[in-house]
Each structure stands twice: as C-alpha cells, then as structure tokens.
Amino acid sequence: MKRKLYWLQILFISVLAFSCNKYLNVVPDNIPTLDNAFTSRSEAEKYLATCYSFLDNEGDPGVNVAYLAGDEFWLKYPQPTGSSTNWNIARGGQSVVNPIAGIWGDKYKGIRVCNTFLENISDTTKVRDLSIDERTRWTGEAMFLKAYYHFLLFRQYGAIPIVDKNLPINAPLAQTKVKRQPVDSVVNYIADLMDSASKKLLNNVINPSTDYGHITKPIALSMRAKVLVYGASPLFNGNKDYANFKNRDGQLLIDPDFDISKWKKAADAAKEAIDVCKSAGIYMYTFINTTGYPLSDITMTQMSIRNAMCEPWNQEIIWGNSSTSTWGLQYSSMAHIDPNNAGNTAIGPTLGPTMNVVEQFYTKNGVPISEDKTLDFSNISQLRTATHEERFNLIENYQSARINFDREPRFYADLGFDGGVWYMQNSPSHTDEDTWNLKCRLGQFGATNGNTVTTYYPKKVVNWKFVFNSDNTMYLLDYPFPTMRLADLYLLYAEAMNEAYGPSDEVYKYLNIIRDRAGIPTVQESWTNYSKNPSEYTTQSGLRAIVHDERNNEMAFEGSRFWDLRRWKIAAQVLNGNIVGWDANGTADNPESFYKLTTYFTMHFVAPRDYLWPLAEGDLQVNENLVQNPGW
C-alpha cells in the first residue's frame, strides 16, 4: 500500500510538471459523437485531442517495446513486479495467436479518428467560430498524425494497408477486406502526407505555455526524413529474403532490388528538415551551469549529454511527446547513490544495461575499444584503481573493472556502475568535487535494496533534479520523451549522405558536430591517430560502420537501437548471442567475485521471421486478403 502511495505521489508531481501541456493529455471519456464534435471550436479541439491520444507512452519501459524487446536492457528473472510483457519478445516468446506489443488495431483506430476529423474540419460550414489560420494548422496536425500512425504500423509490420479515407458505414463487405500495399507505396504515401502537412504548420508553437507538444513544421519534416531513411535501409531496400513475399494476387510487397535513389531522396529530405530546424531556432543543446557552484569541464560535458534527453523542452528537442510520462523510466533506472538514504524502498532499479551496450561506447580517443591501438581492453574485468585525475568519472582510490576506465564522456554520462561518479543537483557540496557515487557490491549501500541484474544503470534517462529521501519519499522532474531531437536528425542525414554518395566532408561535418558535444575528437583525428584501421573513415563501408556506432552511442537508451538493428538488417548477427553482465552476488570484500562475467540468457533471433511482427491469426481469419509476414 505504501508503494502505491509513493507512485501516486510521483504521478502527482508529473501532472504538475506537465500542467502547461494539459491539452494533449485531455482525452474525452468517449470519442465525441459527430452530432456534437464539430459544432464549436471547443468541441472540435476535443476531437483533435482524441487524434493525439493514440500516441504511445514512449517514456514507459513497459509500453515502449524498444526498451525491453531487444538487447539494450535486461531484467532479473523472474520479474516479481512491474510490466515486463515486452521482455518476452527478447526471450523468444512472440506468438501469432496474441502478438506481444501488437499495434494493428489501435493505430488503425487512430487513423480512422484522424480521417473523421479531416473530413469534418475541411467543411467550412462546420465549426464556424474557428479561424482560418487555426483550421489550417489543425488540419496539418491531423494529417501528420494520420501519417505517423501509418509509419508506426510500417515500422513494425512492413507492408500494410493504406487507409486514406474511411469507408462509408454501408460499404460492401468485400470492400472492407483490404490487402497490404507494397512497402515502397506505403513509404511514399507517408512521406508525401507528412510533406503536405508541413505546408500547413508553423515553425514554432504560438504559445509555449499551452501548445508544446503540438505538431510543428520541423516535426513533420524531420519525421518525413526518418520515414524515408527507413524505406531506404537494407531491410526494405534490396532485401532478397523477401523476393517471394507477395499478396494473394501475386503483387510483390518488398522490392528485392536495391535502389540508390531512395537514399538520395532521404538525404534531401533530411537536409531540408535541418534547414527548417535552424530557422526555427532548434540547435544542439549545451548545459549552462546555473548552480552558483563551480563544475569541471568533464562534468559540464556529461551534463550536456544527459540533459539533451532529460531537460524539458530544451533547444535540441524537435518533438517532445508530452502525452507520455517518464516517471516509470526514471524510477526503474535510478541507483541508490546516497548512502544516507540507501534504505529508500521507493527506488526500484530494474533496467540493467547489458554488456553489449557497455562495450559499444568508444574509448576516450573516440574509437571502438577493439580498434584503439593505444589502449588495451583485452581483459575487461581486470581490476584497476582510480586516480585523482580520474575523480570526475570514477571514485578516487576505488577499484573497478578495466572496461570502466578510459572511456568516452558518453559512457560516463549515460551509465552508472560500481565505482562510478553520479553528479546530481543535490550533490553534498553542490560541486563535482564531492558528489554522489555508486558502490553496488553486496554489503555496500548501492546494493542495499537490490541491484540491476547487470549491475549497470542507465544514468542518462534520470533527470539530474531527481531527489529521494530516507523516509521513502522522492521528487521526480518529469520530461517529455524526445521522440525526435536534432542529434538524431543529424545522424540520419549523415547516414543517408554516406549511403547515397559515399564519404564526404558533409558527412564528417555532421558527425563531428555530435562528437564535439560528446567531448571526443573528430572522426578524421580519432581514426588517423588512434585506430588500428586509420583509413576506415575514407571508405563507404568503413564510414557506414562508424555512422552505426555513432548512432548507437549518441541515441543510447532512447529507443533507437532496437529499430536500427532491424532496419540495418544486422539484428540476426547482433541478437544471436549471450546477454552478459557482472555477478550481482559478488561481495564488497571480494571484488573479483563481483567482476565475474555472467551470462544471463542466450538470445535466438530467427531471420527473416523476427525482423517484422506477426499479424494476429484472428485478423487473418477475418480478412482472407491479408497475408502473414514471412516465417510466421
């Protein structure tokens, strides 16, 4: 009962934090009847809010399938509490009978609601008290949402039926049994609709105090670029595995022939979006120290990385999903870093970043740990004692594993670990000279109320103003989930440019903007001076690997890795392996027992089956024109 009260307390705080966005959080008890929905501006606005209500709660790790269905996080097994259904996908439990995290029915319902709104709002005899400008903007918002829901379906299922208009209620039964449309047609439809929507939208919301979360032109064009990148990626562009994937009438659903023009179109779209974002005042976030206390350059860099995700409505956010709450994500990620409050049972650390992610981050020289010719990571569990010079990243004079030393700033910004420093706003001295840290071997304060299974923590997702106390209370600053931020768009552009034209100064430019904020040298400097493969960045395949790594590192814990591994068509290589971490049963007086690589699970990814979701058997039985995805 106590824990339920704590959760309610957090939810109350979340509501306060998002009071300015209450419009997007107001969903009518029932979808308004058409008799009343378009009689006035206020009623039409409620219907528009219903269009928004089908956006996913991306900040909830139990809802956002990208958090638990891949290899980025792992949970303790069995899970005593909480929603971990999506984790069953990672454990091989997907099914055609009742597909886990299926969105087929929900998103098509959202599309139908958007269609109804668009059909009625276009009739100028309705909603007579609505201004022309507002009618235009609302039309653009609903058009985008309709396109976005199609994108979510495409991303998950591949070829899908396009529902451009609602069928009349008396439509013949045969007309309702729609078939799936080819992926190229789906991608072009979504991209064109988003482009049309963008022409009706403004660069910025008119009133930030009430309108944040509304769709704007930068959102529409940035998501259009992402859609086109997905359509150009190997899963859907030149994938021979789908050469025989056809509708019952023989129509090919995924073209097995590679088409480079798709990458060129994606690159053009990304550049257009970048230019619009610039004109809208969207730029890379940099932390400004307003604490009144000195902070080292090392901590300042880490705070720029952390707050790019967690600072509400910061200047890098293109689309912040204010329909979501991140309290569950933060609660599940926060470590017991304050020894005075180690007994706080309201903290429930469950999300454990895997060794796949830990090893993914670069060295301090900006190259993969396997490529750095100046640093030896052959024995990642070897014990090493942190020095005074390393005190802003690791606990001085404390032993930790080799893998936790000499890493890039994003490693220390994104991950909490045994022996690591964890700066927060309420740090004891308010400086980073005397700040919180994490000691989480058995018998230490960090493990008082349990560890994550891997003993790593996703520090990045926890807002630096999170506070918890000895009396089991906490203060949590919620933030809109960053569905799209500028770094994401820059990476999409760099990827598309390399795939379309090969290595160029333009690709390096946008990669290096991100690397500069991350506190590492340029691509050229890092590979020339530190890599065992100094010319890697000069070839298209080599630069592709660098772009992939850069994306995994920059977008860690934001729900990108799960989908990127699939669209790059490398999930079968990455997700057929062991889930590894340290031994959480290792004790404080025996660090060797803690730093023992432990396998928790062996994943089995079956290609091509697991690249796409299965359609539910029930849907196939109702509509015989639908065909199942290959392998299911």
Descriptions of predicted regions:
Residues 1-29:
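Bacterial Sec-dependent N-terminal signal peptides
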Residues 19-20, 107-110, 189-191, 267, ...:
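Long, intrinsically disordered, low-complexity segments
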Residues 20-70, 116, 123, 133-139, ...:
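Acidic, glycine-rich segments characteristic of secretory precursors and extracytoplasmic regions
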Residues 45-61, 79-157, 173-217, 381, ...:
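Conserved, well-structured interaction surfaces
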Residues 146-147, 224-228, 480-521:
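Extended amphipathic alpha-helical segments enriched in small hydrophobics
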Residues 154-155, 159-161, 227-239, 499-502:
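Short coil/turn linking the two alpha-helices of tandem helical-hairpin repeats
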Residues 160-180, 235-265:
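Short coil/linker segments at helix-helix boundaries
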Residues 336, 355-356, 362-371, 375-485:
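Flexible, polar/acidic helix-loop-strand segments at domain edges
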